[in-house]
Amino acid sequence: MNHSLILKDSPNIDFYGLSDISNRVLWGDAFSVLDKIEPETFDMVFIDPPYFLQLPKRKLYRWKVKNTVEAVNDDWDKFASFADYDNFITSLLRKVHRLMKPQATIWVIATYHSIFRIGKIMQDLGYWILNDVVWVKTNPMPN
């Protein structure tokens, strides 16, 4: 069977079996796609949720290098409040948890703006945090 690497979600699809999604990227709204996958499917889950950077509406200048911060300014990273963001993360983590096998591992990518909120929510939902992995980025935004 010849599958393309990318599988675009469709409202006409009600269910994805493991053979449908194995070694593929599912392109679509995460909340919709996650609901279509059988429970306890994955041994490992990797999520990179919105960071909710809350950058000001004005330009942020980097005085030492004489330029401005080019930040995420897309709708998918905007939330009306911390409560809205927390509700989004809670919903996402519940949906993901349903798909994880009992001994599965989850990796969550975040920034210092959001990782502690996400970690608290994970603990409140019963996730056990084994470790923190810190990637040192030499050109972070804003710097």
Report residues per predicted region.
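Core catalytic lobe of class I
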Residues: 1-143
